[in-house]
Amino acid sequence: MNFFHKVVSVVRAYDYRDKVISVAAVAIFSLMLVKMIIFPYGMLGLGETKVYTEGIVSKNGIQNINPLFVDYNEADREVSRLVFAGLMKYDSESKAVVDDMGMLSISEDKTEYVFKMRDGLKWHDGKPVTAEDVYFTFHDVILDPSFPNEILKMNFSGVNVELVDEKTVKFQIEKPNIFFVANFVIGILPKHILSGVDPADLLQNEFNKKPVGAGSYMVNESLETFPNGRTQITLERSPYYYGDASDIEFMRFIAYPSMEDLIDEVDSVNGVVKVSGKYISDFQNNDRFELISYELPQYTAVFMNMESKILDDKNVRLALMKSVDKDTLLADSTDKIRVDTPLMELSQEDWYYKYSLDEANGALKDAGYEYREEDIEKAGIRYNDDEDALELNFIARLYDEGTYQEEETKKVVEFLNSVWESIGFSIQVEFLPEEDFKSRVMSRKYDLLFVGQALGYNLDTYSYWHSTQSTPVGQNLSNYKSFQVDSLIEDIRYVFNLDKRKSNLKELAKNIKEDVPAIFLYRPVYYYATDGRVTGVSMKDVVFSSDRFAGISKWKFD
């Protein structure tokens, strides 16, 4: 007798009441099975009370919900922003970093930062948050030599961390730094859970799948990964959070491999972050959604390796810059704004440069590069007196075929290549897979590099333009070295007088403009799509898209 017949025999033996219950149970189980097949990552909560579902595009999905590794993955940053809390937080209304779990006092000489923890702070498991957790996060983890996030570790290089008492921790820095305070927005980790984990192994630890933080939301359903490439996590409002409670009881995040995948299932989400480019019209044409535009402190540029034999000549760099008509490049763009200086605190209009092919050709002539019109084999390419060709290598990241990133990257690179070849350059373009691209960037094996840079909360230029940062882990991608620029960058860090700082910024912008280490092209414009189920969402003056959650206590269900 097979299994089915056995079940039928058992059910026939039931009385009428038991048969009804059995049939109902089978029906419920069948519905649940259908739901799991059709919606393997949940029904998404569109009709559920106080549940708000956001869609995120991330090729790698949500991976590690840990505040010390959010630089690796934007999707992780979104979730971590709600799960964890730091000593300080970014306030988009004041555009400043303000007190959060810690109350800060700074010494008169601006080298000592003392935090006193608020009363009543608790982790999501109900245990108290103390200064020991702060000391553990910064001293035992970030400053450990084996900690893998080199950029974060560099931010605290030379910093002395002292545990004063159970509520107080002190940070001592070598020199005043107006930007240093922005480092304290980093979420704090629970010592009582992670003290036995080697910092070198923290990125792979299971804690990152179902973390315990002290933020406004706690994990309700741990991180799940599905065969169709989606990842999902559900958070619930934390009863232990010290701040104002949100009206949103549950936040659900679903990460899709591509925007196309998300749009196919857009009726399953309430909000979508970082909509851009050709996808804008998909939401404009959908009556459910309205779009909120926002910009981030980031830009895309072509960095010129000043250690390249050809690019060591300023006239060559000037020719590359002057030949690019940014207005033509961006004429049909709905998600890009022209940029002429990397200093986001300054007005871009004040640093506008004029495109001129005549000046570009003149600069190449001044550099000693001429056409060899009499030689057919050398036609169209300039050469110097040593018969060295005006030949450059140009690298860019290769994105997945058919994606918006791939289309836009190729479009811009091909535009630039066409312009430069028209004035006598021979450009060898390489689109490189992610790991190869990173390797080439770290080793600085390129003449021209097409890439974007994000500045973060402090707008500190040190990492990007100081000569000490032209290293594999540094972000001085042009190998730009200038004593005057280094001095200005250091003064901007050390001077707390705002007028003096503004003057130094303008002088720095002037030096960068004159030296031409890069061609600054544009900054992206993004859109947040919301179906209006909640009100109060603001994207004004955010630094990261996740900063919208700074005001989540003001979000209300309509």
Question: Where do the model's predicted regions map?
Answer:
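N-terminal lobe/hinge region of extracytoplasmic solute-binding protein
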Residues: G55-E108, H139, V212
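Ligand-site clamp/hinge motif
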Residues: R237-F283, S426-Q428
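Surface-exposed binding/hinge segments that line
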Residues: I151-D198
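Gly/Pro-rich hinge or "lid" segments in bacterial periplasmic/extracellular proteins
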Residues: I186-S246, F250, E260, L357-D358, ...
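Detector for C-terminal structural segments
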Residues: F29-I37, M321-D350, E408-N417, V441-D558
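Local pocket/hinge segments that shape ligand/substrate recognition
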Residues: V273-A363, N384-D386, L390-L392, L398, ...
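A structural "hinge/loop" feature
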Residues: S58-R77, D99-G102, K127, F180-L189, ...
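Ligand/substrate-recognition segments at binding pockets and active sites
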Residues: P227-T231, E370-G452, Y526
